[in-house]
């Protein structure tokens, strides 16, 4: 079965596929453009990205997710960063290499898939540039790379779905699951849809057999992870706090109602353009399904591998939109760009190839949606400012200066100036230097609230197996006792309490708070702009080897 459309009534021009060489060349070019864009527009990793770097740092200290520290479901996120740091060191450029490479993979596969579906290099170029320009947040790289590869697998494999390919779909679903569990759910939904729809015309026996292969392969491939989790905390003990954490995180960002266009401000202002993109992203997969059904009903199309692939990507898109499209939309929309780009390319290809009485209408509608979406992306993603940052629209010589500045910054392990991830880190810079001088590399820190950047920039592991001590994050009596057991077995000279969140910490984790009160003394108060500051504590009874000359604080290593 060939991956092509069947035509009727003379409404479309004959299909001409771009050559494989042209697709490969353009896909490689897209990946290089992506790397250049991500590097030139780099403005530091935000605080959320440091969650995964803190986990990676823990792994380099010999700890493993679940066994030694709590993990809500991101083991491969830590592992990829840990592997890169183990091979190439702690420089910021190492993590940027990981991120840029993943986004480059996403762009290349998006281009390859879009060119296959649209039969047009021009359309594939447009949607891929849209994806690049949206500049998803750095820690969201799996949302681009994984879904682009999945879409490509659906489209290319649909016409010949062998047992080996079904097993590979299951394996890829497991990989996605281990990056973040919901990725496995969304990609798994699309994969199962592909298996069903690509086997639909091969008879019930073949259909049931292929579903069995997919589900069986999933079970077998997930078994080692499931046994590992069951051995250390139990599957119920693993999923229950993880789901509570995810539910609490989603509670503050879930869309309570469909976003509305506002007419009290600029009609084409950012708020309205965010709403426009939201409805474009939500509408595209349903538009694809309706278009497929209508073409089948009109006899313009028969069920083919392309039908199965487009439907599978649509199922994946609908599922991921439910999970990804939350508030704030400006930050969340880029996460869902891949299926929108791929499916949008298919719709554009149909419109641009159309001939006959309704061709002008199809062209006009597609041109309007394309132009409106392009402008929305420019505004929502602040593309003009990003171009200035990169030195592309700046004064002559700005790009050269930008490259020279990045070369210095990215060679260091510590971010500087405007690349610092948080006010806490900026305030704690002298403390980081003190920790480096006066504690051992194997010592740990406790930090209340969620400030994973503190552990990475201090180059010290988090204590108690928790990078955050905050409400809804592993706060049950069992979780607190497990954290205390780990704390007692570790060397933890310092505790940092974020006073702005102190009341929440005391209420949510009384056992941990009591332990800190019993075993630690106040050391210093670090002022943080617009907050109550950070209270530093030092372990009571720990014998110093001397006094730090710069701070007057106890030093616990001989110098």
Language-model segment annotations:
Residues 23-32, 204-230, 360-374:
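Hydrophobic alpha-helical membrane-interfacial segments at the cytosolic entry of transmembrane helices
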Residues 41-55, 66-81, 90, 233, ...:
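Extracytoplasmic catalytic/substrate-binding loops of multi-pass membrane glycan-assembly enzymes
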Residues 73, 182-185, 229-232, 366-556:
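Extracytoplasmic
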Residues 97-118, 149, 153:
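Transmembrane-helix motifs of polytopic, lipid-linked glycan transferases
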Residues 131-133, 166-181, 187-192, 219-220, ...:
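Membrane-interface alpha helices of multi-pass inner-membrane proteins
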Residues 150-168, 201-202, 279-307, 346-349:
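Membrane-interface transmembrane helices that cradle and orient dolichyl/undecaprenyl
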Residues 185, 319, 325-368, 384-389:
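Hydrophobic/aromatic-rich transmembrane helices and adjacent perimembrane loops
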């Amino acid at each position: 079965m060939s991956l092509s459309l069947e035509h009727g009534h003379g409404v479309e021009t004959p299909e001409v596929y771009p050559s494989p060489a042209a697709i490969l060349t353009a896909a490689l070019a897209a990946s290089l453009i992506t790397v250049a864009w991500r590097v030139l527009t780099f403005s530091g990793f935000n605080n959320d990205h440091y969650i995964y770097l803190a986990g990676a740092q823990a792994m380099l200290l010999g700890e493993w997710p679940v066994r030694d520290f709590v993990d809500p479901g991101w083991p491969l996120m830590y592992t990829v960063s840990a592997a890169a740091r183990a091979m190439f060191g702690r420089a910021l450029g190492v993590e940027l290499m990981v991120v840029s490479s993943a986004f480059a993979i996403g762009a290349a596969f998006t281009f390859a898939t879009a060119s296959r579906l649209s039969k047009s290099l021009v359309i594939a170029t447009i949607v891929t540039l849209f994806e690049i320009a949206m500049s998803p947040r750095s820690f969201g790289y799996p949302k681009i790379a994984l879904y682009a590869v999945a879409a490509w697998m659906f489209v290319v494999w649909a016409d010949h779905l062998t047992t080996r390919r079904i097993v590979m779909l299951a394996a890829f679903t497991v990989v996605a699951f281990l990056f973040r569990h919901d990725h496995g759910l969304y990609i798994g939904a699309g994969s199962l849809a592909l298996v069903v729809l690509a086997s639909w015309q091969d008879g019930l026996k073949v259909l049931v057999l292929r579903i069995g292969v997919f589900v069986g392969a999933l079970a077998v491939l997930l078994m080692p992870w499931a046994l590992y989790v069951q051995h250390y905390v139990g599957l119920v003990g693993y999923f229950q706090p993880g789901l509570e954490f995810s539910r609490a995180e989603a509670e503050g960002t879930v869309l309570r109602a469909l976003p509305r266009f506002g007419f009290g401000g600029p009609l084409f202002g950012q708020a309205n353009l965010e709403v426009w993109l939201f409805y474009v992203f939500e509408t595209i997969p349903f538009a694809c399904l309706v278009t497929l059904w209508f073409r089948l009903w009109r006899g313009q199309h028969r069920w083919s591998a392309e039908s199965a692939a487009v439907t599978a990507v649509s199922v994946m898109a609908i599922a991921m939109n439910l999970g990804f499209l939350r508030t704030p939309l400006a930050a969340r929309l880029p996460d869902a760009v891949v299926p929108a780009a791929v499916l949008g390319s298919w719709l554009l290809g149909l419109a641009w190839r159309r001939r006959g009485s309704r061709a002008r209408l199809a062209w006009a509608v597609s041109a309007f949606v394309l132009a409106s979406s392009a402008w929305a992306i420019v505004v929502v993603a602040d593309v003009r400012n990003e171009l200035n940052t990169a030195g592309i629209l700046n004064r002559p010589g700005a790009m050269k200066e930008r490259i020279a500045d990045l070369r210095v910054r990215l060679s260091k392990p510590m971010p500087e100036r405007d690349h610092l991830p948080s006010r806490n880190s900026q305030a704690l810079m002298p403390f980081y230097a003190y920790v480096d001088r006066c504690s051992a590399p194997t010592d740990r820190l406790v930090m209340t609230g969620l400030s994973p950047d503190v552990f990475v920039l201090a180059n010290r592991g988090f204590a108690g197996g928790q990078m955050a001590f905050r409400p809804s994050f592993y706060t049950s009596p069992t979780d607190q006792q497990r954290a205390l057991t780990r704390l007692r077995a570790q060397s933890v000279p310092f505790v940092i309490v974020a006073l702005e969140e102190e009341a929440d910490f005391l209420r949510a984790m009384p056992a941990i708070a009591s332990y800190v009160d019993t075993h630690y003394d106040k050391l210093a108060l670090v002022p943080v702009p617009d907050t109550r500051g950070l209270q530093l504590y030092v372990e009571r009874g720990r014998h110093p080897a001397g006094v730090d000359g710069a701070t007057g604080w106890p030093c616990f290593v001989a110098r």
